[in-house]
Amino acid sequence: MGIVRAHLRIYGRVQGVGFRWSMQREAKKLGVNGWVRNLPDGSVEAVLEGEEERVEALIGWAHQGPPLARVTRVEVTWEEPKGEKGFRIIG
């Protein structure tokens, strides 16, 4: 298993429901690096970097999110890894 990088856009009721904090907790649990932030259009953007199976697991989590979230769509773009360290919330 190699290191991969996924760029996500998550749509639905994903702001004001603890999505970023919950994603950070899940990422740390899985050992995935990257970042997450809210966007002005109401969506959430995230970059996930780590072992493929762990990144895939976090993408799977993103389709549900925390209990108060209502995810309607997740767009995933695969990119070249850039060496992210840790997982942070931006903004």
From Swiss-Prot:
Keywords: Hydrolase
Pfam families, A to Z: Acylphosphatase
Acylphosphatase-like domain span: 5-91
Reactions performed catalytically: an acyl phosphate + H2O = a carboxylate + phosphate + H(+)
Active-site residues, as the UniProt record annotates them: 20, 38
Alphabetized GO MF terms: acylphosphatase activity
Its EC number(s): 3.6.1.7
Family, as annotated: Belongs to the acylphosphatase family.
UniProt name for this protein: Acylphosphatase
Species of origin: Pyrococcus furiosus (strain ATCC 43587 / DSM 3638 / JCM 8422 / Vc1)
Gene: acyP
